[in-house]
Regions:
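A short, hydrophobic C-terminal helix/tail in secreted or cell-surface proteins
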Residues: 203-208
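Cytosolic covalent-transfer regions centered on His/Cys nucleophiles
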Residues: 1-202
Length: 208
């Protein structure tokens, strides 16, 4: 499932001005509602806030990925907001957040939010990807940046599947994160990149 299949133009805001974490989430939920993915806005919003109580989704480096899986959602969806001035989101690194992606997943979809979270986290490992999103002047440009990054990622994965070495070392890495799984996915991506630089083959497993 591609990110661009879930992220509609009406659910993207390039000039967000929330002043607090609470305002940020409320505005993100309103963007999600525009996409028609939510049947009960208040219930979905409560689900997002409940997830935040378990641990912040401000993963650091100016990024937050709040999410909720609930029967208040009728179809998987994404919303995105750029906050030029940044906002205090209680992020893990204590820094302001200027890029937020909100994920909505229905209870009927098995782990769809984890799939989306995984793809987003891995793309956001590339600082140039994030900067291009922040610099986007139009929603269309923002979506085009996401589309190009996904295409490049898919091509790299296909090439990796074809060019599996017949010999050499293989590295198995198991990662875990006590504050949420976004860092687990990002760690797995980082391990694979490091292994590639050393010409090793890596199988990074996520402990969810």
């Amino acid at each position: 499932m591609r990110i661009t299949d879930l992220l509609k133009a009406c659910s993207v805001e390039l000039n967000g001005t929330p002043q607090t974490k609470e305002e940020t989430i409320k505005q993100m939920v309103a963007l999600m509602e525009k996409g028609g993915n939510v049947t009960d806005v208040e219930k979905y919003k409560a689900g997002v806030f409940a997830r935040e109580e378990e641990g912040t989704t401000g993963i650091g480096e100016g990024i937050a990925i709040p999410h909720a899986k609930t029967d208040a959602v009728n179809a998987p969806g994404l919303a995105a907001m750029v906050i030029p001035a940044g906002v205090d989101y209680d992020a893990l690194d204590g820094q302001p957040v200027d890029l937020v992606f909100l994920i909505a997943a229905p209870n009927t979809e098995d782990n769809v939010h984890l799939e989306v979270l995984s793809r987003l986290s891995m793309l956001l490992m590339d600082e140039s990807f994030k900067q291009n999103l922040l610099k986007a002047k139009t929603v269309e440009e923002f979506l085009a940046v996401v589309d190009r990054a996904e295409n490049a990622k898919n091509e790299a994965e296909e090439e990796k599947a074809v060019n599996v070495p017949d010999s050499g070392y293989r590295v198995l890495a198991v990662t875990a994160c006590p504050t949420g799984i976004a860092h687990t996915y990002m760690a797995a991506e980082g391990i694979e990149k490091a292994a590639s630089c050393l010409l090793y083959t890596s199988d990074a497993a996520d402990e969810l």
